[in-house]
């Protein structure tokens, strides 16, 4: 959203050698109108590409929305826009382990509405379950992590101190409880 759009920061991220991708939520923004979502997607992609190179995209889970942002690809093809990858379609999770801090925790799949992959059950059986960053670093130090891992992180959730940290903790805790209710209601 607008709070995460800062031209100078976006350019600086690329200047540091990082890839900049588009974290889209157009089905949600356009109330499920797939054609409007496509137009909105292209508009924002073009706007971002005026600043930096963009070759990858990833949907925003939008847990409170009744619309799944990935559904835009049921009709349209992101590759036609020069996009080379969308993780939920282009990563083989049989070969790549997935860790996300969704819900401000590394085992956020328990409360995630849309940020899920089918292989999660297999990883749980293999003992690849991590609650804290310390759990992950311990597994790394003990050579217990797979060779290929995709991380999805939300840096604002890991603030260093005081009020911002507590505010994020409180907000994410409330959000996780709401998502649990949504998951139970949708079963």
Where is each model-derived feature located?
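Alpha-helical scaffolding within the catalytic cores
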Residues: 2-12
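Terminal accessory/targeting
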Residues: 4, 15, 27, 34-187
